[in-house]
Amino acid sequence: YRYPELTLCGNRGYGDGLLSGMVIGLPPVLNFGSEEVKRKWSRSSAGKKFISLAISEAHAGSDVMGLQTTAVKSEDGKEWIINGTKKWITNGTFSDYFTVGCKTEDALLSFSSSADLVSKQSRSRLACMDLQYSAAAGTAFITFDNARAPVGNTLGEEGGGIFVMLSNFNHERWVMCCNSARAQRGMVEECLKWTNQRKAFGKPLNSLAIIRSKLAAMISRAESCQTWLESISYQMCNMSYKQQASKLAGPIAFLKAYSTSCGQETAADAVQIFGGRGITRTGMGRYVEHYHRTIAFDALLGGAEDVLRDLGVRQAMRAMPADAKL
């Protein structure tokens, strides 16, 4: 839970800039890489190198099966030759290496990554993207032009990258849920302090029933997200990585969609409570303004809310007995 505490600094992209690669780019290497790859990364990634997860493309966000970046083996069969583009890649502008999702020659998704995978020196071009939430995250548009990576850096079996990606999404979305729940609790704290301090119509804001109603809704959303998060976290701590991938994808998807949806409602309520200060980038309402301006980003990371809700339902339906009926 150290990562969520960074949300309280008031800069949404600061935590992403520091830790995003470790949270979503490195786990596939440690969980699916060969022993040689893992040994190499355990030495080079200990505070010395940055790595990014490169999956999203201009034409494929939540639809990971629609990736157009290709990986073709070299004539000697020792390297992957990678061509394509990646978009909205967090930490991409300053990363040393990339964990890349691509399609192989047989049109099945494959995943390749390691310290030698696709480096900035391996025929790749980076462009910083101008987003509304923060430049501190180093979000990039990446072009791979005949970039090369050793075949030994493939994560998991060739053609089995879809399992690697989907299982990694669980951890990625869980971290987003941690951030969302903590940020909402931070907004509740700001609003409780402000409504106790601010006077309107000759008395504190929190003496007004309509304000207390908004506070009640904010607290209910924040605490329900936190409680659900702790339940899933307990299950994660008592399951193997493979069990998490097969049993928790649906619940985590539901929680992520729910928590970011709650976050948007909380942001809107917080602005109403702070009034003009809630849309001012400086002063007492600066945290509320920043949260309201950047909350939409959380709803898209790791899969759009509607896509995640559908994923959760499909996971539940898949586990139902074929003869289930009233």
Place the predicted regions along the sequence by residue:
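Alpha-helical interface subdomain recognition
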Residues: 1-9, 17-19, 32-35, 74, ...
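FAD-binding glycine-rich core of flavoenzymes that anchor FAD
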Residues: 4-13, 17, 28-57, 75-78
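A short core secondary-structure module
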Residues: 78-124
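Flexible, small-/acidic-enriched active-site or ligand-binding loops
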Residues: 118-150
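Long, acidic (Asp/Glu-rich), low-complexity accessory segments flanking structured domains
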Residues: 146-164
